[in-house]
């Protein structure tokens, strides 16, 4: 019984990514990157003049404020950008 319990604990630890980090899309959404530690948000950056085409995507630690020229959209799930 102890062996079974130990086996289940080991399998659980292996299956769970204990050092889990966020995965965010790159500019072309077919490709993504694993974010470094501390950067737990994904973002898209748009030019205000054209809100349909993002000009940059990636990982970030804090969502920047929008400006008169640039709009940011941030999210906190894998590949949400």
Curated annotation (Swiss-Prot):
Originating organism: Naja atra
Family label: Belongs to the three-finger toxin family. Short-chain subfamily. Type IA cytotoxin sub-subfamily.
Quaternary state and interactors: Monomer in solution; Homodimer and oligomer in the presence of negatively charged lipids forming a pore with a size ranging between 20 and 30 Angstroms.
InterPro entries reported for this sequence: Cytotoxin_Cobra (IPR003572), Snake_3FTx (IPR003571), Snake_toxin-like_sf (IPR045860), Snake_toxin_con_site (IPR018354), Toxin_cobra-type (IPR054131)
Expression sites (tissue/organ): Expressed by the venom gland.
Record's keyword annotation contains Secreted: yes
MF annotations from Gene Ontology: protein kinase inhibitor activity; toxin activity
Paired cysteines (S-S): 24-42, 35-59, 63-74, 75-80
Any single Pfam family the record assigns to this protein: Toxin_cobra-type
Signal peptide span: 1-21
Keyword Lipid biosynthesis: no
Compartments where found: Secreted; Target cell membrane
Domain of life the protein comes from: Eukaryota
Record-given protein name: Cytotoxin 4
Biological processes, Gene Ontology terms: killing of cells of another organism
Gene3D superfamilies: CD59
Function: Basic protein that bind to cell membrane and depolarizes cardiomyocytes. This cytotoxin also shows lytic activities, but 2-fold more important than that of CTX-A2. It binds to the integrin alpha-V/beta-3 with a moderate affinity. Inhibits protein kinase C. It may interact with sulfatides in the cell membrane, which induces pore formation and cell internalization and is responsible for cytotoxicity in cardiomyocytes. It may also target the mitochondrial membrane and induces mitochondrial swelling and fragmentation.
């Amino acid at each position: 019984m102890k062996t079974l319990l130990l086996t289940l604990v080991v399998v659980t630890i292996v299956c769970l990514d204990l050092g889990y980090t966020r995965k965010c899309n790159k500019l072309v959404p077919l490709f993504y990157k694993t974010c470094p530690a501390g950067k737990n948000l994904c973002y898209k950056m748009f030019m205000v003049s054209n809100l349909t085409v993002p000009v940059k995507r990636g990982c970030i630690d804090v969502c920047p404020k929008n400006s008169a020229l640039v709009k940011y959209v941030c999210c906190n799930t894998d590949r949400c950008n």
